[in-house]
């Protein structure tokens, strides 16, 4: 819609996003963006230069569709989704009670 190329899924970025979701689920890191710069540094070491990066996180007993709908109704999250990024990775971690932690990382 915005004249941008489609995002390309990247398995390494997804592994970094998954680790963050698991860390939030386990309580090793609080819910949110703590450690964002370290995650981007890890991606940079593996993939090379990154000019810009962003991250969306969510938690709750909800579907991926509900998470994306929520992000699209939040100006900051929507800006990331519609941003001029090239690569993305998504990771989610689920607890036995149905609570799910979602992380999506965007890079260019």
PLM feature segments, named:
Residues 1-108:
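Functional surface patches built around histidine and acidic residues
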């Amino acid at each position: 819609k915005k004249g941008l190329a489609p995002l390309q899924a990247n398995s390494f970025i997804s592994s970094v996003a998954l680790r963050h979701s698991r860390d939030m689920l386990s309580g090793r890191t609080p819910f949110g963006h703590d450690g964002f710069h370290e995650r981007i540094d890890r991606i940079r070491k593996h993939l090379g230069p990154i000019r810009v990066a962003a991250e969306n996180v969510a938690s709750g007993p909800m579907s991926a569709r509900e998470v994306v709908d929520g992000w699209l109704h939040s100006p900051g999250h929507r800006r990331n989704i519609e941003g001029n990024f090239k690569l993305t990775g998504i990771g989610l971690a689920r607890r036995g009670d149905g609570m799910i932690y979602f992380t999506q990382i965007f890079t260019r």
